């Protein structure tokens, strides 16, 4: 919209506002919404939804049109609903800051002419035929749903997300009924747990042993949520849980186990961790339990899209309630990345008697799409809230005492009886662990102190730097830390590999080289808070690529070509036909002689999967990636690049997630002082009704 149009809208508002007897007209409200869209405060999609409602029902009250646009905007930012009680006191907090006086005036004038009382908004919503009152009306396909309209916290939903949220709550409640999957020999279970978790003299697992408690809780139920920070042993615990289920199964040879994660990278890490842990445990238990056979039977971990059978071009899956998964135990890692719609589909596709184990860090970033399911499920995780019956069960089966501080003082929530929070980190200590803890606790001063005081170089702060200085972390790199120099060194081996692989019987040289390039690339990553701008993913990808071309590490034509040898890419759209999924990382490399055709190679566990570059349309260069996309990955050195003007994207969870991607070294790039403190003070809050739907479900143990 032009500046003249902005002024015309303001004049129209001023004329309306000058006569208090004239109510705000729907057409005027739509004009204001379009102005907010052109200001960047709303998306065109948001306004289009309100416009459709206005077109189909011209009598719709202006406040309903505004609520509809705001609801669409909230969903686009990861919320599953619009919390109406929070809308009136702080409307601008939902939109973000206005750009310029004209937009600020439109916002202020619009809000001044909308009903000041929540009751008036609710009355208008109830009067709209497009809105279903969840507690009163029959479902007639209305696109909007008003939930808890008579409570102090009413919420407005798009119909699809209301249905997903209700489905997840229903499935979770059903799985929390404590109906044993099988009869349990508690004495045998206790014996196996004692062998799987032998007492450690230094108390390395903590007191009580929450890993052991998690296994005991999982043994009796069809749902277990295991949360904890990095290094607390979530997959270590899950592997021992699998061994326990095998040892106590009536017919162990028929136990069907599946592993899954939201991304291919996370799935591969889950499988590797489970296999390694079970292999070590096999040596510990000897011939009494055949864990090697279990490893072979489990097979490869899969992405959730692959597991459920994503149908190309649709939001539907081939696995659902009418055609459930053929599985007895499903372990899902990186559950914080699972959005509301995916969780609903997953729960629907599970057989009622199957066990579901969710692993994840509740403090990480939630999924990009709507919902913060793991966070909602873990609302009581830190407090414990265990019933007396649950504490008795844990003591009987695991020999562990749950302290009174972790027991419920009143009615015990049912979900809490199926949730375990691992509290002792064995791997994630030192400055990186201290930094993550300070950020997670909202202590910006301590976080800065850790960054500035680390003598071993494991953490570092680049303050007041330029994008060029951030690029130097990638090439040539920070002293003593991984960078893309390792990846460039492996790329440079191609001429020798090409010559060797051309010889009969030495074709395996090419595959070994591809693996070495992929592994070297995964040692470092630039992580960005935003996508656009010099400090964003796009700008830094371009700058790193240019630096590598200038250094001779990439071919000279890389700057002008869509594809070149060495280009790392991230898949941005699921393509089951090609066997690639959103978030997969691959590198374009020459195929084995004599072809020499560029193909993108992906590591899928121990195997390599390749796709011709001409068939990959939905990819983006991946020298730098957003923190959201990095979830499920781990790098020897991770560099987190903050950006001014990031608004709500710059959050505590974003910084925590970036830090916890680092295994050995972490660098924070802060273009201007104060960005870290701003982020740490700003925790992410996702509007959702899932937690409320689960409250009040008491567990009887």
Language model features with spans:
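C-terminal accessory regions
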Residues: 531, 584-701
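N-terminal accessory nucleic-acid engagement/regulatory domains that precede
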Residues: 3-16, 23-185
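Short, charged beta-turn/beta-strand-edge "cap" motif at the junction between a beta-strand
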Residues: 573-578, 644-646
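Residue-level recognition of short, solvent-exposed, well-ordered loop/turn junctions
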Residues: 351, 562-565, 581, 630
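Conserved helicase motor core of P-loop NTPases
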Residues: 363, 367-569, 575-577
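ASCE P-loop NTPase helicase motor core
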Residues: 213-215, 219-453
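Pre-Walker A adenine-sensing motif
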Residues: 203-219, 513-514
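N-terminal pre-Walker A segment at the start of P-loop NTPase domains
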Residues: 186-209
């Amino acid at each position: 919209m032009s500046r003249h149009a902005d002024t015309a809208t303001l004049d129209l508002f001023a004329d309306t506002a000058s006569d208090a007897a004239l109510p705000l007209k729907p057409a005027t409200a739509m004009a204001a919404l379009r102005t907010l869209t052109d200001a960047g405060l709303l998306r065109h999609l948001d306004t289009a939804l309100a416009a459709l409602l206005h077109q189909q029902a011209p009598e719709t009250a202006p406040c309903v049109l505004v609520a509809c646009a705001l609801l669409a905007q909230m969903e686009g930012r990861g919320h599953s609903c619009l919390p109406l009680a929070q809308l009136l006191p702080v409307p601008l907090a939902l939109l973000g800051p206005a750009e310029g006086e004209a937009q600020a005036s439109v916002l202020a004038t619009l809000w001044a002419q909308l009903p000041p009382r929540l009751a008036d908004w609710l009355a208008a919503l109830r009067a709209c035929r497009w809105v279903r009152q969840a507690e009163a009306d029959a479902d007639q396909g209305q696109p909007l749903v008003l939930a808890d309209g008579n409570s102090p916290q009413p919420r407005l939903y798009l119909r699809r997300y209301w249905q997903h949220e209700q489905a997840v709550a229903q499935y979770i409640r059903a799985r929390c009924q404590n109906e044993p999957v099988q009869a349990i020999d508690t004495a045998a279970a206790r014996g196996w747990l004692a062998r799987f978790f032998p007492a450690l003299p230094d108390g390395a697992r903590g007191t009580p042993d929450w890993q052991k408690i998690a296994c005991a809780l999982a043994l009796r139920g069809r749902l277990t949520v295991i949360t904890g920070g990095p290094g607390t042993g979530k997959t270590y615990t899950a592997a021992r849980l699998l061994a326990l289920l095998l040892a106590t199964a009536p017919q162990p040879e028929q136990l069907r186990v599946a592993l899954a994660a939201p991304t291919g990278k996370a799935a591969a890490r889950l499988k590797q961790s489970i296999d390694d842990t079970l292999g070590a445990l096999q040596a510990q238990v000897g011939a009494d339990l055949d864990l090697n056979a279990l490893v072979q039977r489990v097979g490869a971990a899969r992405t959730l899209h692959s597991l459920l059978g994503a149908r190309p071009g649709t939001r539907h899956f081939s696995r659902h309630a009418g055609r459930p998964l053929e599985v007895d135990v499903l372990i899902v890692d990186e559950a914080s990345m699972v959005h509301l719609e995916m969780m609903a589909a997953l729960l629907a596709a599970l057989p009622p008697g199957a066990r579901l184990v969710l692993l994840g860090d509740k403090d990480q970033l939630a999924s990009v799409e709507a919902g913060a399911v793991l966070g909602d499920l873990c609302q009581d995780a830190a407090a414990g809230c265990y019933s007396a019956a649950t504490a008795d069960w844990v003591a009987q089966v695991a020999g562990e005492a749950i302290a009174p501080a972790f027991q419920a003082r009143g009615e015990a929530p049912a979900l809490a009886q199926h949730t375990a929070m691992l509290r002792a980190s064995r791997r994630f200590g030192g400055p990186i662990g201290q930094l993550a803890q300070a950020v997670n606790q909202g202590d910006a001063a301590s976080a800065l102190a850790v960054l500035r005081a680390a003598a071993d170089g494991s953490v570092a702060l680049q303050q007041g730097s330029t994008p060029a200085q951030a690029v130097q972390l990638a090439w040539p790199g920070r002293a003593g830390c991984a960078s893309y120099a390792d990846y460039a060194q492996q790329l440079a081996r191609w001429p020798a590999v090409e010559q060797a692989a051309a010889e009969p019987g030495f074709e395996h040289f090419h595959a070994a080289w591809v693996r070495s390039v992929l592994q070297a690339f995964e040692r470092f990553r630039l992580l960005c808070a935003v996508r656009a701008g010099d400090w964003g993913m796009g700008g830094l990808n371009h700058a790193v690529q240019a630096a590598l071309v200038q250094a001779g590490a990439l071919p000279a034509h890389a700057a002008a070509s869509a594809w070149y040898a060495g280009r790392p890419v991230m898949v941005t759209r699921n393509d089951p036909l090609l066997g690639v999924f959103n978030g997969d990382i691959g590198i374009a490399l020459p195929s084995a002689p004599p072809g020499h055709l560029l193909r993108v190679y992906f590591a899928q566990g121990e195997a390599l999967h390749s796709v011709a570059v001409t068939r990959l349309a939905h990819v983006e260069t991946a020298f730098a990636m957003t923190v959201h996309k990095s979830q499920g990955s781990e790098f020897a050195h991770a560099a987190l690049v903050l950006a001014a003007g990031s608004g709500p994207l710059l959050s505590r969870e974003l910084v925590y997630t970036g830090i916890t991607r680092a295994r050995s070294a972490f660098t924070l790039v802060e273009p201007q002082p104060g960005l870290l403190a701003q982020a740490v003070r700003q925790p992410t809050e996702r509007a959702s009704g899932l937690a409320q739907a689960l409250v009040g479900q008491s567990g009887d143990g």
